[in-house]
């Protein structure tokens, strides 16, 4: 269960925020022992765990995600969970703890931890998430796939991994762009060439560049 900022005094909120920011684990433990909730929300509606990732406060993060009472799936105001942020920052050991020991949600609706891992080209994190059942073609609110984010990152090995795990080249985002179009938009020439070659082998035709209109089924 998460606890709002209002449940704590402003002094406690300020002290905890500062302690997490500076990775002062002793102070964090002291405040929690004094009754401050480890599910406290701080700047920007961020859970302490998410804030710890943002501030690169590794000691504090490792401590917090190990506490049984911490809600690891509570998002910030942008819908980001600690697993998403740890994936974005390439924190594989923490990602493993969150999934294996805390049961953090991998396949949430919208943007997922896999999207976030692919955004910064974190191959090891993406590989691990896929091994744990992450949906390779998960769609964000804008119909962006992890493959599109991997293409933007420029990590060719990651792009290959996703394709080998079944990523669909034909998916287009809400603007009508495919992963191939994304490669060309972000000047990833080598990736674009490889994806076009793969397209021709799979679909026996040359790729015609986007964007293409995305068909939306009308309601009956």
Listing of model-derived features with the role each one plays in the protein:
Residues 27, 59-60, 93-94, 124-125, ...:
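Conserved ankyrin/ankyrin-like repeat signature
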Residues 40-41, 72-75, 105-109, 136-139, ...:
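Ankyrin repeat boundary signal
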Residues 3-16, 165, 174-177, 181-220:
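Ankyrin-repeat-protein effector appendages
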Residues 32-37, 62-71, 96-104, 127-135, ...:
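Ankyrin repeat domain, specifically the short helix-to-loop turn at the C-terminus of the second helix
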Residues 8-47, 51:
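N-terminal segments that cap or nucleate solenoid repeat domains
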Residues 88, 109-111, 115-127, 131, ...:
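Alpha-helical adaptor scaffolds
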Residues 18-23, 51-57, 85-91, 116-122, ...:
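Ankyrin repeat A-helix N-terminal signature
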């Amino acid at each position: 269960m998460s606890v709002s900022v209002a449940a704590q005094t402003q002094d406690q909120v300020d002290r905890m925020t500062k302690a997490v920011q500076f990775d002062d684990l002793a102070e964090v433990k002291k405040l929690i022992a004094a009754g401050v909730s480890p599910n406290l929300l701080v700047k920007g509606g961020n859970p302490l765990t998410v804030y710890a990732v943002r501030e690169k406060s590794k000691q504090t993060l490792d401590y917090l995600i190990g506490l049984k009472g911490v809600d690891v799936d509570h998002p910030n105001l942008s819908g980001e969970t600690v697993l998403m942020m740890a994936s974005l920052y390439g924190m594989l050991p923490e990602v493993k703890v969150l999934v294996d020991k805390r049961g953090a949600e991998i396949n949430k609706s919208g943007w997922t931890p896999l999207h976030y891992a692919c955004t910064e080209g974190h191959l090891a994190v993406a590989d691990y998430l896929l091994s744990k059942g992450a949906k390779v073609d998960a769609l964000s609110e804008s119909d962006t796939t992890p493959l599109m984010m991997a293409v933007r990152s420029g990590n060719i090995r990651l792009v290959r991994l996703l394709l080998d795990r079944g990523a669909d080249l034909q998916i287009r985002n809400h603007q009508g762009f495919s992963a191939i179009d994304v490669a060309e938009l972000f000047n990833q020439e080598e990736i674009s060439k490889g994806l076009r070659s793969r397209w021709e082998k799979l679909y026996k035709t040359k790729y015609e560049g986007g964007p293409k209109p995305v068909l939306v089924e009308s309601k009956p």
